[in-house]
């Protein structure tokens, strides 16, 4: 795709796993930057924006202010943004402080990209964002840095779906 900036991990870093679906996303239990285990299923029934990213990924860093603004603007409409970071807890914690991230950031390794691949990220690039409607169905996907207007469009569609 021309003009899309992403960061990709070398293919040898992506591990094989069983078939993943939206249920596999909800089944994830990952630590947050403070080491507390968080179940993605706690956000079931809300519009869930799962953003796969890394601290070393420039396009990921570029989209963060728009994601922070979207969380603030859309929270009252039942939207929850969750960042799934591919990095160490310390780096993610420092990033959250420096960028004033106001939504949950979870910590994982590159194996979580298998879930992203089965949710439509065949390129394995970052950032990758999946929007799930309240019923758990995929409402939207985006590979590359999101702009505010793109996020708002994805969320308007997802919140309108029953």
What are these regions (language model features)?
Residues 97-103, 108-156:
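Thiol/disulfide oxidoreductase modules built on the thioredoxin-like
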Residues 61-100, 110-116:
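Structural microenvironment flanking redox-active thiols in thiol-disulfide oxidoreductases
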Residues 39-58:
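Short active-site neighborhood of thiol/selenol oxidoreductases, capturing the structured segment around
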